[in-house]
Structures are given as C-alpha cells and as structure tokens.
Amino acid sequence: MEDDLYARIANIELQQAAIATLEPLRRIKIKEGLQKVLEENVGKENYDRNRLEQEIIFYIEKIDISEEQVRLKNHCEYFKDVLKENTISKGKKLSFILQEIGREINTTGSKAYDSDIQKCVVLMKDELEKSKEQILNVL
C-alpha cells in the first residue's frame, strides 16, 4: 500500500511539474487575450497602454497560482515524510494532509483559466481520490 501511495503522490508531482512548464505560456495567453478583447471592443488607439499594463498585472496577480504550487509541493513532501514514519497511527495524519493537497489542487484549478492546466488538475484530482481511498482502507 505504501508503494501505491508513493506512486500516487509522484504522479501528482509530475502533473505539478507540467503545470510549472505551462504557467509562463498561460500568462502570455491571458495578456494577449485581454489585449485582443480590448482592441476589438474599444479600438487599438482608444485606450491607454500603460493603464492596460497595470490592469493586466493586477489580473495576473489575482489568478497567480505560484503560492498554491509552493504549498502543494510542501504538502506532498510532508505526506512522503509521514508515510516513511515508523508509527502505527499515521493514517489520520495522512488523511489530513491529503485534504490540504486537495485544497491546493482545487484552488489551482479554479484560478487557472487554461485548458492544459485544467487537464493536469483533473489528473491530480484522480490520483488524490485514489490516495484517499487507500487511506480509508487503513483507517
């Protein structure tokens, strides 16, 4: 069972690495998409480009997923550390850590606005659910 849980967390970490490679492209797509919508609705010359840059920065900060990714990485590491512990009663602790992992995955998904990142989130959720099922078998 431990090997299966390690594999599930490793799969979550693989998807997280994929998200890290997609993140810079997502920011560019968001910026270009906002600019295109603005130009289509207002015109190319009818807006202040400096103001647009400020608004784009604000928007990108609002949907930034870097904090969630850092916390997700930390939770995965903590999960593996607890899994290594040689104690009998680690099931509840692992269950709580999986809840935290789930929160970070869900927040990433809700902030992403990117289909490729959403695919990674779905795969991570699948691995998370399988991990929860394994833990429930122990409890």
Task: Annotate the PLM regions.
Residues 1-139:
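N-terminal intrinsically disordered, cationic/polar leader segments
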